[in-house]
Every structure is written in structure tokens, then in C-alpha cells.
Curated annotation (Swiss-Prot):
Subcellular location: Vacuole membrane
Segment forming the signal sequence: none
Gene name of the encoded protein: CCX1
Protein name per UniProt: Cation/calcium exchanger 1
Tissue specificity statement from the Swiss-Prot or TrEMBL entry: Expressed in roots, leaves, stems and flowers.
Induction statement: By salt stress and drought stress.
Keyword Ion transport part of the UniProt annotation: yes
Source species of the chain: Arabidopsis thaliana
Length: 570
């Protein structure tokens, strides 16, 4: 109990630091909104090359922070892609202390990654889990649809934002491919090296199925990138690859289940890996079968802890934590038993329409039109809030219209995930302008690593401690997850972007390094696909060492180009 309490204090300390920093950054945001010095705009435009295509090009030609501050205030191309103007904060507030500015923006990057993961874990995934139960989806179908959507939400929305909001499609392409490469090569390689001496084998059919589907998706994507343009029909065809995967998986699961019933043998959970059952379906079944004892024990530990533990420090943490917790809690309807609160539910239903309107108006300007939308959304929110107050109880979540409540929670959790992803992409683009690094490189590395860190920790832990079943779950996740992100995470933005250009075509951003990334990624997949069967599907150190070498070789090549060590014509 002491360790649990100390870990709780540790998490409270982390929450305290994050929220203090959040408040501090809001102050910096408003402090940076002062007008530029008069009489300097025309001179700076002439000196910095006001007609240059990129903001970083103009900034690179300026020396002192004051001229850079005035320049970014005068150039629309240096405007923020999100809600906070990071370039103004860096050059206008921390211009004389760039090291401090770097630390502040790096810390905020960590906060955004935390918020993105916490929103998905605390609001998005519970909504999906409840929806799967209400819709009575089979474990396999829930696994490859809702569970995959929950796990891939950060990548999906970051990609959508980069294509639609920031007009940096190459950023989204690099982040998705970078994440897929990291998981399928670095994470798989790490797993193989760590458990290579344990003689652990995985199911051949499941492995080949997932890798082949991922290779097919990458080949189609490579063809699209090579052509350089995509129509709405091509984008829909690319998106349908995942539908084929789901259909193939469902048919396979149906015949496996029929075979088990005909044999009339009760299979133990240890035999599931040998039957080729999908990882995602297996995870879903595991979740459904978990005993409630563990959850109850944790509840007992925390609920029965003496109130003397509730010190002034914990109260202070709760108060300062409101800037991060309260906005989401008061706009996302939560209908699970553990977190049910009628006041919060009523307020969230009333405010949610206004937040959706704000998100829409932030994309489309027009004061008169926006005012009308705010009035309409406020009226709708008032009516829905009154209905929620009259039809809910304090003691338990609503039993009637549960699907409506769940859809509302799902919609608002999607909204928050999108908003945070938008801010994350905006910050990375600003960091690219500050350091003079292409945003696509940051998407390939920083964003891909940040979104895939959870996969690294979870899959390595499951494989290391779970024996054969754990290795099967981890390896399948390392291929099924990237397949979802590659097809859905890129297919959805391509459909949205090509639909906006219809009946024309959407032009894929020109970036030759994308084909290079695809090539290395496919080499890693082919290495595993060839070597694993030769090793009788055992997770051998040779497999892991080869995958790690491929990834590190690729990463070294890209970083050498970024820092000017290797200069090649591309």
C-alpha cells in the first residue's frame, strides 16, 4: 500500500507540474499578442525576402530576435496552425533567452503528448468499449474496428490535421510511415532480441496474413505517391483495403469458430495462438474475461485509505489540475458507473454544441455567420441540457437512450482529440521553422516516436512476461496497428482532401524521401517475412538484429542529411 500511495503522490506531482506549465503557457500566449513595432514591416519584408515560400526561409536571413519578431508578426505564412502562436512566444518573449524558449516549447510538447494520450485513454477508448457492448459486436469485429480506432486515434487525427488544417500533407505521410516503421522494425526487433533465447514461436498464418496485407497497402500507397495525385475514387479504393482485411479476418474467425464447435472441444486460452485467431480479437476476449477482483482491490486500496493521507498538497494538485481536467470533463459526456456525475453530464450536454461551433468557426471566418451559429448552438445546448437534467438521475447513468449518450461522448472525445492533435502538429511545424528543419522530418521522428511510445512499452512488456501467448499478442499488434494507421490514418485524410478538390484531383506533396521511407519499411517487412518462416516462426535474435539494423541505418541516413553531414541531390 505504501508503494501505491507513493506512486499516487508521484503522479500528483507530475500533474502539478504539467498544470502549472499549462497556466504559464496561457499567460505567454496572451503576452505575445502585442502589436509589432511601427515602421519596420516594409523594411523587414524587403530584407528577409517577403516573397519566399516558407517562413523558415525568411527567418534564416534575419540575425537578431527583434527583427525576427517583427517579421513573423507581418507575415501571414508565419501565422499559427493552431490556437497558440509559438513563433511569437519564442522570438518575441524568449528572444533574449533562446535556451529558455527551447525548454518551454519542449516541455509543452511533452504536455501535448500527455494530453493526447490521456484523452484517448480516459474518454475516447471507454466510449468505444461501451459502444461495442451496446452494439453487441463480436470480440473480433470490435477488435479490428473500435479497438483499433482507439489505439490509432492519435496518429489518425494528427494525419487528418496535417492534410486538412495545416496543408502539410507530407508531414502527415511521414508521421504515419515513421510510426509504422518504428513499430514494425524497432519494436519488433527489440522484442526478438529480448526474448530470442527463450525459444518462443508465434502462429505462422496470422503473421503472414498481417504482414502481407501491410505490404499490399504500402505498395498501393507507394504507387499513389509516385503518381503524385489522387482522385476521390482512388482514395476510396485505398481505404477499402482495410475493409478487405476486416472481411478476411471475420470469415477466418467464423470458420475457426465453426471448427471448434464441430469438434466439441473446449479450447483453453493457451491454444488460441495456434488457431490463428487475430490478435485484436484475442485482446478483446481477454478484456471481457478479466475478473473484477483486481479492479475491486485497487478501489479498496484507494477508497479505504485514511483521510489523513489527503493533505494540503493533494488538494492543491486537484485545484491546479482543473485547467487540464475541467474543460474536457465539462464538454465530454461520461456515462460509465465509476465516473457518473449528473451535474457534469448536464453541463457537458449544454456546452458541447458551443464547442463544436467554436471548432467549426476556427476553420471558417465570417463574423456575421459565426454569430448566428453561436446563437443556434447555444439554444440547442440549452434545450439539450434541460432535457438531460429532467431525464437523468444522480445515482446512476441513464438507462434509456444510452446509445445517444455514448455517441455524444464519442463525438466530443473525437473533437478534443482532434483539437489537441491540431495543436501538436502546429507546435512541431513551428519547431521546424525555429530550427530550420523540415516539418516532415519532425513528423517522421518526434511525432512518430511520441505516438508510438505506448506501443513500445506495452508490446515489449506483454512479450517479455506473457510467454508464447504474450509474444503472439505483441507481434500481431506490431503489424495490425501499423496496418490500421497506414490504411485508415492515411486513407481518411486522402478521401477528405480529394473530396475537397472534386471533380479535380488532390496533388500529393512532392517529397522524394517518402519513397525512400517506404522502401526501407518494406525491406524490414520482407526481412521478417523471409527469415521468420526459416526460423520456424521463432523470435530469433537474428530477426531482431536485422530489423534494428535496418531501422538504425535508415534513421542515420535521414539525420545525416538533416545536419548536413550527407549532402545528396534528391
Amino acid at each position: 500500500m505504501a508503494s501505491l500511495f507513493s506512486s499516487r503522490l508521484g503522479s500528483q506531482s507530475l500533474s502539478l507540474l504539467i498544470n502549472i506549465f499549462f497556466i504559464f503557457l496561457i499567460f505567454l500566449h496572451f503576452a505575445s499578442q502585442t502589436p509589432p513595432p511601427s515602421g519596420s514591416i516594409q523594411t523587414l519584408n524587403s530584407f528577409a525576402g517577403g516573397d519566399s515560400d516558407s517562413c523558415s526561409g525568411g527567418l534564416a536571413s534575419l540575425d537578431d530576435h527583434r527583427s525576427k519578431c517583427s517579421y513573423i508578426r507581418s507575415q501571414s505564412k508565419c501565422g499559427p496552425q493552431g490556437y497558440i502562436d509559438y513563433l511569437k512566444i519564442f522570438f518575441c518573449i524568449f528572444g533574449q533567452s533562446p535556451v529558455l524558449g527551447h525548454l518551454v516549447l519542449s516541455a509543452w510538447l511533452f504536455v501535448l503528448f500527455y494530453l493526447l494520450g490521456d484523452t484517448a485513454a480516459s474518454y475516447f477508448c471507454p466510449s468505444l468499449d461501451s459502444l461495442s457492448k451496446v452494439l453487441k459486436l463480436s470480440p473480433t469485429m470490435a477488435g479490428v474496428t473500435l479497438l483499433s480506432l482507439g489505439n490509432g486515434a492519435p496518429d489518425l487525427f494528427s494525419s487528418v490535421v496535417s492534410f486538412t488544417r495545416s496543408n502539410n500533407g507530407d508531414f502527415g505521410l511521414n508521421s504515419i510511415l515513421g510510426g509504422a516503421f518504428f513499430v514494425s522494425s524497432f519494436v519488433v526487433g527489440t522484442i526478438c532480441v529480448l526474448i530470442g533465447s527463450r525459444d518462443v514461436a508465434i502462429d505462422r498464418n496470422s503473421f503472414i496474413r498481417d504482414v502481407v496485407f501491410l505490404l499490399v497497402a504500402l505498395c498501393c500507397l507507394g504507387l499513389i505517391i509516385f503518381i503524385g495525385k489522387v482522385t476521390i475514387w482512388v482514395a476510396l479504393c485505398y481505404l477499402s483495403i482495410y475493409l478487405l482485411y476486416v472481411g478476411f479476418l471475420s470469415v477466418s474467425h467464423f470458420f475457426d469458430r465453426k471448427k471448434r464447435m464441430s469438434d466439441q472441444i473446449l479450447r483453453s486460452r493457451e491454444d488460441l495462438a495456434e488457431m490463428g485467431v487475430s490478435l485484436l480479437g484475442y485482446i478483446a476476449e481477454e478484456k471481457l474475461a478479466l475478473p473484477e477482483k483486481t479492479t475491486q482491490e485497487f478501489k479498496i486500496v484507494f477508497e479505504d485509505s485514511p483521510k489523513r493521507h489527503r493533505s494540503c498538497f493533494s488538494v492543491l494538485v486537484s485545484i491546479i489540475g482543473l485547467p487540464l481536467y475541467l474543460p474536457r470533463r465539462l464538454t465530454i459526456p461520461v456515462v460509465c458507473e465509476e465516473k457518473w456525475s449528473k451535474p457534469c453530464a448536464v453541463v457537458s450536454t449544454a456546452i458541447a454544441p458551443v464547442l463544436l461551433t467554436e471548432l467549426y468557426c476556427s476553420h471558417y471566418s465570417g463574423s456575421q455567420r459565426n454569430l448566428i451559429l453561436y446563437i443556434i448552438s447555444g439554444s440547442i445546448g440549452l434545450i439539450v441540457g434541460i432535457l438531460a437534467y429532467l431525464t437523468t438521475e444522480k445515482s446512476h447513468p441513464p438507462k434509456k437512450f444510452s446509445l445517444v449518450w455514448l455517441l455524444g461522448g464519442f463525438t466530443m472525445s473525437v473533437t478534443w482529440t482532434y483539437m489537441i492533435a491540431q495543436e501538436l502538429v502546429s507546435l512541431l511545424i513551428s519547431l521546424g521553422n525555429i530550427f530550420g528543419i523540415s516539418p516532415s522530418v519532425l513528423g517522421l521522428t518526434v511525432l512518430a516516436w511520441g505516438n508510438s511510445l505506448g506501443d513500445l512499452i506495452a508490446n515489449v512488456t506483454v512479450a517479455f512476461h506473457g510467454g508464447n501467448d504474450g509474444a503472439q499478442i505483441a507481434l500481431s499488434g506490431c503489424y495490425a496497428g501499423p496496418l490500421f494507421n497506414t490504411v485508415i490514418g492515411l486513407g481518411v485524410p486522402l478521401v477528405i482532401s480529394s473530396l475537397a478538390e472534386y471533380p479535380g484531383v488532390y496533388i500529393i506533396p512532392s517529397d522524394n524521401s517518402l519513397l525512400e521511407t517506404l522502401g526501407f519499411l518494406m525491406v524490414g517487412l520482407l526481412w521478417a517475412l523471409v527469415i521468420m518462416p526459416k526460423k520456424k516462426m521463432r523470435l530469433d535474435k537474428l530477426v531482431g538484429g536485422g530489423l534494428l539494423a535496418i531501422y538504425l541505418c535508415f534513421l542515420s541516413l535521414r539525420l545525416a542529411r538533416v545536419f548536413g553531414v550527407l549532402d545528396t541531390d534528391r
